[in-house]
Each structure stands twice: as C-alpha cells, then as structure tokens.
Amino acid sequence: MMWGAGSPLAWLSAGSGNVNVSSVGPAEGPTGPAAPLPSPKAWDVVLCISGTLVSCENALVVAIIVGTPAFRAPMFLLVGSLAVADLLAGLGLVLHFAAVFCIGSAEMSLVLVGVLAMAFTASIGSLLAITVDRYLSLYNALTYYSETTVTRTYVMLALVWGGALGLGLLPVLAWNCLDGLTTCGVVYPLSKNHLVVLAIAFFMVFGIMLQLYAQICRIVCRHAQQIALQRHLLPASHYVATRKGIATLAVVLGAFAACWLPFTVYCLLGDAHSPPLYTYLTLLPATYNSMINPIIYAFRNQDVQKVLWAVCCCCSSSKIPFRSRSPSDV
C-alpha cells in the first residue's frame, strides 16, 4: 500500500508532492531502463516485520481451530474468521512490501491494496460478530445452544466477508486515484471518498460495539447480583467478580479503539498532501490490532492453551479433555 501521496513508497515526482505512477513499469521502458526501485525506509521495514508477526500468530490460530475437531462451536468459527482476516492482512503487508521494493509492480500493488482493505474490513467485521455472539449468549442464554445459533453464525460470516469483499474490490475495479491524484487520500491509491466510506463504516461498527458491550456489562452485573443473592455471597465478592468482568471488557474495547481510532480519524482529516509520516504513525497501531487479537480472543482460552501445550509435548489434541465453553470464554 503506497501509504501517502508524498510517501517514499509513492515514487515522488520531482518538485511536487504528487505521485509519479509512470515511474513504476516494466524492466525496460520505451526510452530505456525503468527508474530504479525505491529504497525502503525504516517504517516500511517495521510494517513488513509487523505483517510477518501477524501472519505467524494468526496462522497458528487457524491451524489450531482447523486441526481440532472440538473447536467447531459457533464462537470458534467467529474466532477463526477473525484469525483468517488478520492472517490475510499480515500476508498482504509482507507481499506489498515485496511488490513495491522488490518487484516494482504497480498492478500487483493495487491488487494487494484491495486485499488489505478486504482483510482489515473482515477483521473489524469479525470483531463485531464476536461481540454480537457474546451479547446473544447472555441475553438468550437458554436458547443459545441451538441450531438457530449455528445458522445465525453462518449468516453473520457471510455478511462480514461479503461486505469486506465488496469494499476490497472497489479500488481494484475502478474506485482509486490513479487517474486523478488530487482525489487521493492519505493512503495511495485509495481515493479520499473511499477512505471516508471506510471510516464511516468503522465508526458505525465501533458505536454498535460500544452499545453491545454496555448491555453486556448490565447483564453481567445483574446476573452476578442474582447469583450472589442465591448463594448468600458477601457483597465484596460480588463486587470483585463484577469489577473483574467489566475490566476485561474495557480492555478488549479499549485495545480496539486505541489501535484503530488514530488512523480512522486521520483518514477523515488528511488528504494527498498530508505528511506520509503521519500515515505510518497512525497505521502501525492498526496493524497491532491484528497482532493482539489472537492473544485476546484465542490464546487466553484455556482449551486453546491445552492444545498448544499438547502440540509442544507432541500429544494428540483428540486426547485432551475439553470443558464446556461459552462465548464469554473467548
């Protein structure tokens, strides 16, 4: 992804802040050798390293879920969707680095920009689906474990990936700024309008997640109070348990906001002439979200930890005793 119209990745025109796309071409141009490939800057290398770490983490999660028959519950399908999306995002960052600095292919770079847009959109959409699943598991606790839940999960996955695919195809098909550099946003070759659409979609998802987590906190507090009364627990015990649950939800939502809000706001405020360094500084935390998602939604789960331990000890995951699971465990 050529992160800014003034970015070193964007092959700057001499004396201007616009992108000279014509400098990316075949090995031999019509009048001689093509321009040399750009040299990566420190932040380009950092993004590539981040993509590598993201790919490795999420590939491990995908392998665990696919290779463990016990992980076929709806909640693990959603976590698997999140891991696949983040895996694609990590691979997209690495391949884009290669496309820009090793191959010099503008066409490949454009396709990878679409892949990254699709992957990050699917990642955020999967986070929303996980939040919806958590809420419904508490709100409809008695009917959650039914065929309806499985059907609903597949519907949510279809909507998430269908929407992500649509937004990812837009820059590849036509909605880009290759022919009109003045319409570029902070991420070349995505147009300003495309970035605005993505930003609005993010704020809608974030608003829904805020509302759902607020409802989850209310339900958790009410359930904890009822359990405390039934078991005659001390108020202090009820308070500690409730506070711990709310703190966990706050960490989950806070991490998501801290990673994505800076870049989303910058997409709305910046344009093609904005300093590319700001794009890197706001985009890098967004990639960290794909890095911490496996920790929050997979590796904290005790059953996943058992599988990891079994793999390290060369044991079969089919022999591992799994406890009953609920979405709140993920």
From Swiss-Prot:
The modification Phosphoserine is found at S324, S326, S328. A lipid is attached at C313 (S-palmitoyl cysteine). Induction: Upon cold exposure by a lipolytic signal in thermogenic adipose tissue. It is a multi-pass membrane protein. The keyword Kinase does not apply. One of its GO terms (molecular function) is G protein-coupled receptor activity. GO terms for cellular component: cytoplasm; plasma membrane. InterPro entries: GPCR_Rhodpsn, GPCR_Rhodpsn_7TM, GPR3, GPR_3/6/12_orphan. The chain crosses the membrane at residues 43-62, 75-98, 111-132, 154-173, 199-217, 246-272, 278-299. Keywords: Cell membrane, G-protein coupled receptor, Glycoprotein, Lipoprotein, Membrane, Palmitate, Phosphoprotein, Receptor, Transducer, Transmembrane, Transmembrane helix. It holds the Pfam family 7tm_1. It comes from the Eukaryota. Expressed predominantly in the central nervous system, and at low levels in the lung, kidney, testis, ovary and eye. Highly expressed in regions of the brain implicated in the Alzheimer disease. One of its GO terms (biological process) is positive regulation of cold-induced thermogenesis. Glycans are attached at N20. Residues 63-74, 133-153, 218-245, 300-330 are cytoplasmic. Residues 1-42, 99-110, 174-198, 273-277 are extracellular. Constitutively active G-protein coupled receptor that maintains high 3'-5'-cyclic adenosine monophosphate (cAMP) levels that a plays a role in serveral processes including meiotic arrest in oocytes or neuronal development via activation of numerous intracellular signaling pathways. Acts as an essential activator of thermogenic adipocytes and drives thermogenesis via its intrinsic G(s)-coupling activity without the requirement of a ligand. Has a potential role in modulating a number of brain functions, including behavioral responses to stress, amyloid-beta peptide generation in neurons. Belongs to the G-protein coupled receptor 1 family. This is G-protein coupled receptor 3.
